[in-house]
Amino acid sequence: AAKAMFSREGFDLANFREELLEKGKDSSLQTIRDEIIGMNIFNSVFVDCTASADIASLYKDFLQHNISVVAANKIAAYETYRELKTIARQRGVKYLFETNVGAGLPIINTINDLIHSGDKILKIEAVLSGTLNYIFNKISADIPFSRTIKMAQEERYSEPDPRIDLSGKDVIRKLVILAREAGYKLEQEDVEKNLFVPNDFFEGSLDDFWKR
């Protein structure tokens, strides 16, 4: 089982891995929720660097308990976007997700500044997938497509499951996030996509995908 540690005093980063193994308790979503809310630390911020839908499901509860959320995780920003933004505004806390698009470049913040100054965003042009950009730059007569996918994962360009990138899901998530921040009411189903990988490659498990 996954381990977790909680402390109001913080941790010594020089040996936190050893401490986690020795003193960490078995972790669950309920444990994480209860420990963080129970600490009741003023002006606290929950930072999510995972790609977990389960962790993203905790945001609403945290925001309702006056805990700000900063997320690299894209899932909540396209699934429960309006609800979380509304709760954060009502509770006077922050729900921020700048790294969802552009790897931390101030794209979302810039859009917010433009909108708040009265501008209307009409068009955005961007390369939104570092993974696909990497793959298309690497593929050649000497390096087959399958190898470039593996290279992208080894170099940590891709999502843990590269099919999320290849299916266009990651790009669609980013497009929806940007459109919503620009003031448009958009859902994933509104985005047109043209796949360059056959649909049957997305069926089955991740292990099945790598065997093809």
Question: How does the language model describe each region?
Answer:
Residues 89-92, 96-155, 169, 177:
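Rossmann-like NAD(P)H-binding beta-loop-alpha module
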Residues 9-14, 110-113, 174:
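Short, surface-exposed amphipathic charged segments that create phosphate/polyanion-binding patches used
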Residues 69-70, 124:
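Hydrophobic residues within beta-strands of alpha/beta enzymes
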Residues 138-139, 147-212:
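Substrate-binding/catalytic subdomain of NAD(P)-dependent oxidoreductase enzymes
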Residues 50-65, 72-114:
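Rossmann-fold NAD(P)-binding glycine/threonine-rich loop
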Residues 1-64:
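N-terminal glycine-/serine-/threonine-rich beta1-alpha1-beta2 phosphate-ribose binding loop
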